[in-house]
Amino acid sequence: MEDKEGRFRVECIENVHYVTDMFCKYPLKLIAPKTKLDFSILYIMSYGGGLVSGDRVALDIIVGKNATLCIQSQGNTKLYKQIPGKPATQQKLDVEVGTNALCLLLQDPVQPFGDSNYIQTQNFVLEDETSSLALLDWTLHGRSHINEQWSMRSYVSKNCIQMKIPASNQRKTLLRDVLKIFDEPNLHIGLKAERMHHFECIGNLYLIGPKFLKTKEAVLNQYRNKEKRISKTTDSSQMKKIIWTACEIRSVTIIKFAAYNTETARNFLLKLFSDYASFLDHETLRAFWY
């Protein structure tokens, strides 16, 4: 099956955002509503609310100079079970972030159904050191109403962040991170559900660029202070419901978290952005509302 292509480009001209290119084919669906906000919003969806076995989706996005783009979804992206004889469901996203531009990939979590097989690849290329990016990659355990607990066949998510080298066609890699969830019987380490220790939501948040400089410093300082590292993002009733860690690698701040329920994860992320990235419009945090 050939890749289903999609393209999207947004430019900022005299402080006004214009969508200059948008194209998609089934099963991909793109919506860029007109708003009075000082940034552009792109909803990435699929017909039926999910991806079926064998789907292969490829989307290219360009965020022009000085532009701000918030990429969202309308609800969880469902991953349906793999049909015998069909290849893994695949989704590829390539994003270029221009000079002094900001890209926010803050979608709802992916929801893999039982026996699904999914490979996600997300590549981000920053124009220079003035480009900023917030990338959230998170997933759920399955469908709670039928007691699915990490019963997908395989879930793989690959993230790569690069920056262009001035006066050169080359790029330097700032981050490569891969999340793999599958059973490994040969290692005798237990099934996926056993290894996840009842966590229902796990994810990674990556921050880079000058627009998140203060955010990154605040998050890292909070984490270093072990006695107070949870106090500003979770109250005492939530301390046992979520665990998280933070570090910085080649100017990319990485926040990894695991929560016992989705609501706790949403609240954690909402508080984190509200406390440490208050410059973001509340509309950009729609994925954390509940």
Swiss-Prot record:
GO terms for cellular component: cytosol; nucleus. Pfam families: UreD. It is found in: Cytoplasm; Nucleus. GO terms for molecular function: nickel cation binding. The keyword Chaperone applies. Keywords: Chaperone, Cytoplasm, Nickel insertion, Nucleus. Belongs to the UreD family. This is Uncharacterized urease accessory protein ureD-like.
